[in-house]
């Protein structure tokens, strides 16, 4: 509604389409598939030629003790949370200018020294990986842009959280956090580059 042109990507586009948003295009997208990454590049070339903001918000959470999680599930988490983020970022950067902004959504659990929760070995370590990746990219692209920042979120009431922790009530709704991410994506690069901001209304 603010006049921005948005490409919203999700494996399930039905909830996006039901919103009937103006200036918002969406299509089914699997971040682990090279062919889907190429579809995004083709769309940008055909319709925009330039991207101002990329929000990396893909996430897969498996809540299982390290002694029990199989390596296939561990790898699946990394395919989405790390390799997928790297792939889509690499594809979109050529369309961004110096004042562009790449915002990657991580987790407080991925920050060194933070409180860790048993069962989240794959998830938390993957979120730590994208923190380091963003810091590195900010350094690599500091002369040409775009800027890279990370929002390390605390608990937010999302479908992913509800599936992983049935019955848990997070202090923030998905809508509340989405509003914060939106504002930060548009203005945060004026003040930050290569930074990790912890976003949580609860302690720890």
Model-identified regions with their sequence ranges:
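Conserved glycine-rich Rossmann-like NAD(P)H-binding loop of the short-chain dehydrogenase/reductase
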Residues: 4-16
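Rossmann-fold cofactor-recognition segment
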Residues: 21-35
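Conserved NAD(P)H cofactor-binding loop of Rossmann-fold oxidoreductase domains
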Residues: 57-62
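Substrate-binding pocket helix/loop in short-chain dehydrogenase/reductase
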Residues: 65-66, 73-75
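A short, exposed helix-loop element centered on a Lys and neighboring polar residues
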Residues: 89-90, 135
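Catalytic loop of short-chain dehydrogenase/reductase
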Residues: 103-129, 134-135, 139-143
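C-terminal helical subdomain
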Residues: 143, 150-151, 166-204
């Amino acid at each position: 509604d603010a006049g921005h042109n948005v490409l919203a990507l999700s494996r399930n586009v039905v909830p996006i389409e039901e919103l009937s948003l103006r200036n918002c295009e969406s299509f089914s997208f699997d971040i682990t598939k090279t062919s889907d990454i190429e579809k995004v590049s083709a769309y940008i070339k055909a319709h925009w030629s330039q991207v101002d903001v990329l929000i990396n918000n893909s996430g897969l959470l498996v809540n299982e003790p390290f002694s029990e999680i199989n390596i296939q599930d561990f790898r699946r988490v990394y395919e989405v949370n790390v390799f997928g983020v790297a792939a889509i970022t690499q594809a979109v950067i050529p369309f961004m200018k110096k004042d562009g902004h790449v915002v990657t959504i991580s987790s407080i659990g991925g920050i060194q020294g933070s409180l860790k929760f048993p069962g989240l070995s794959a998830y938390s370590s993957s979120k730590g990986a994208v923190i380091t990746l963003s810091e590195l990219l900010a350094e690599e692209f500091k002369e040409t842009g775009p800027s890279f920042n990370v929002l390390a979120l605390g608990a937010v009431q999302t479908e992913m959280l509800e599936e992983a922790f049935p019955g848990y009530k997070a202090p923030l709704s998905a809508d509340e956090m989405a509003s914060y991410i939106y504002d930060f994506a548009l203005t945060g690069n004026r003040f930050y580059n290569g930074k990790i901001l912890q976003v949580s209304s609860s302690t720890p």
